[in-house]
Amino acid sequence: MTLNLCVLTPNRIVWDSEVKEIILPTNSGQIGVLPNHAPIATAVDIGILRIRLNGQWLTMALMGGFAKIGSNEIIVLVNDAEKGSDIDPQEAQQTLEIAEANLKKAEGKRQTIEANLALRRARTRVEAINAV
């Protein structure tokens, strides 16, 4: 039995096909979803979506949003998403270093919050490349 997974951003469909299992980053922790999962709606955190397909695990960097799970269908609406295989490792590492430097230079509460979010997004992209 499989699940139909659809990952959408405001600009495109990132994923729309059947999968065996997913591990979804939510604001209250990661949740595993198998076929016949109980219906839920949940906030999606910045983090790694893990997708099991044909005995392999694939990764996707998610940048926060919402997910609806029900009747073997998962719809994930996020601000942005990238498949781990589509992320350029050098560019992601460079972005991470810039985000770390910007956090050190941040002055005031607003800049610190924005720099922390940018750092979380950059770390997630790097982790999506290296995750299994």
From Swiss-Prot:
It comes from the Eukaryota. Keywords: ATP synthesis, CF(1), Chloroplast, Hydrogen ion transport, Ion transport, Membrane, Plastid, Thylakoid, Transport. It is a peripheral membrane protein. It is found in: Plastid, Chloroplast thylakoid membrane. The keyword Thylakoid applies. GO terms for cellular component: chloroplast thylakoid membrane; proton-transporting ATP synthase complex. One of its GO terms (molecular function) is proton-transporting ATP synthase activity, rotational mechanism. Produces ATP from ADP in the presence of a proton gradient across the membrane. F-type ATPases have 2 components, CF(1) - the catalytic core - and CF(0) - the membrane proton channel. CF(1) has five subunits: alpha(3), beta(3), gamma(1), delta(1), epsilon(1). CF(0) has three main subunits: a, b and c. NCBIfam families: ATP_synt_epsi. Belongs to the ATPase epsilon chain family. This is ATP synthase epsilon chain, chloroplastic. It comes from Coffea arabica (Arabian coffee).
